[in-house]
Amino acid sequence: MIVMTYANFKGGVGKTTNSVMTAYELAKKGYKTLVCDLDPQANATQLLRRTYGLQNNQKGLKIGSTMMVALSNENINEAIVKIMDNLYLLPSYSDFTEYPDFLELKYPAIEDNYKEKRIAYFKHQLDKVKDDYDFVIVDVPPTLSIYTDSAVYASNEVIIVLQTQQRSLDGAEAFFEYLQRTYDKYPSINFDILGVLDVLLKNNVGLDSQILNDAGKIFGYDLMFHMIIHHMERLKRYDRTGIADKDLSPSDFHDTKVHYTYLTLTDEILERLRQKGEIE
């Protein structure tokens, strides 16, 4: 099981959209994929619930147990729901804001290594289902928090999402430095940075090229994904309607373009993993 986290310390850069769309394309390619929504805002959860509703002509997906309840019961399986063939969701809800308090009570500051025990808790629960999935895609809030710490600790790979604006570049650089500190701090942690994913704020704008060039200098051009996600208005609609797909729901050529884009990105991700020997 490969666990991948999409992140940046700047909000609104497309983390959720790109993580969910990658998970969707992995599922379409036959990989059993679980999306873990570690953001209490639950944007990934809402997107996938609407996708389920669109594909099944229903208002939305009914969720029985929340992730917070499942984690406190040490049984995340009870909260996992199926979206479509090969695509599953560990949904977030407003009660997930209680997760830091839950960990503080479970591992009080008087315990040895209490900080690492707290951030390792999610990984230990996720490991219980490692034989059930090929990929786990984790979405996190754009903050330095126990949510991000937990996701990174559980990850094999991290993808930094970079929107072509200066604040996003600053956030990506800060997140890169955070990853280095985290890696050095916890010897048992084991992740790598799979790449930096560029997301264009607007198409054919000169500033985009400047930001991309600066990012290449900062992170290394070999770390930048070849696939660049261009601005597509259709992605905004998905937040409201769910992901349209010609095989499963009403769609048009705009949807076909979106899926081609993310299929190409997914193929590049898989090729990078093959080169590292993580998949066949």
Each language-model region and where it sits:
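P-loop NTP-binding core
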Residues: 1-280
